[in-house]
């Protein structure tokens, strides 16, 4: 039996504008140097820009659909068996799927050149909504890698 204590999960509070845990988590992931207000203002303005581009009234539905399009179903993990390292495909927990999707969208937005962060983030969210862009490509690459290594699924733990 494990002697380690279970890690107590930190409670994420909902954000002020949309009363959503997902938006609050996204703002926390975007944050630099503890400057949450800046992170939130960038996120809120990029969601507004996204809704204006799509002319959709329900901003949260658009944001959630963009996030859902990026969530990976499977990923590969390295497993060492008898001196050889195999890339073993495993299913991704819902919590990790959400975290990976947020991470990929933010990374793709930061990597885009020029313009302000709110414009880059709204463009990346729009691309995610339309199942295109760098974050979606990252998801497809992850799925392709898992598909290529499907033969090693019996090494799962």
UniProtKB/Swiss-Prot annotation:
One GO CC term on file: small ribosomal subunit
Keywords from the UniProt entry: Ribonucleoprotein, Ribosomal protein, RNA-binding, rRNA-binding, tRNA-binding
CDD domains from the UniProt entry: uS7_Bacteria (cd14869)
Coiled coil: none
Statement: the UniProt record of this protein carries the keyword Ribonucleoprotein: yes
Protein's GO biological process: translation
Superkingdom, taxonomy of origin: Bacteria
Keyword Coiled coil set for record: no
GO molecular function term, any single one: tRNA binding
InterPro entries to which the protein is assigned, alphabetical: Ribosomal_uS7, Ribosomal_uS7_bac/org-type, Ribosomal_uS7_CS, Ribosomal_uS7_dom, Ribosomal_uS7_dom_sf
Function: One of the primary rRNA binding proteins, it binds directly to 16S rRNA where it nucleates assembly of the head domain of the 30S subunit. Is located at the subunit interface close to the decoding center, probably blocks exit of the E-site tRNA.
Subunit structure: Part of the 30S ribosomal subunit. Contacts proteins S9 and S11.
Protein family per UniProt: Belongs to the universal ribosomal protein uS7 family.
Name of the protein in question: Small ribosomal subunit protein uS7
């Amino acid at each position: 039996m494990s002697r380690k204590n279970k890690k107590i999960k930190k409670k994420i509070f909902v954000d002020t504008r949309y009363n959503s845990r997902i938006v609050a988590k996204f703002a926390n992931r975007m944050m630099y140097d503890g400057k949450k207000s800046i992170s939130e203002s960038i996120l809120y303005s990029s969601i507004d820009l996204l809704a204006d581009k799509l002319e959709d009234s329900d901003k949260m539905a658009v944001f959630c659909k963009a996030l859902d399009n990026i969530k990976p179903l499977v990923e590969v993990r390295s497993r060492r068996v008898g001196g050889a390292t195999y890339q073993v495909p495993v299913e991704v927990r819902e919590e990790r799927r959400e975290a990976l999707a947020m991470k990929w969208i933010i990374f793709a937005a930061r990597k885009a050149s020029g313009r302000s962060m709110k414009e880059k983030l709204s463009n990346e969210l729009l691309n995610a909504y339309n199942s295109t862009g760098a974050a979606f490509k990252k998801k497809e690459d992850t799925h392709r890698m898992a598909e290529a290594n499907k033969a090693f699924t019996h090494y799962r733990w």
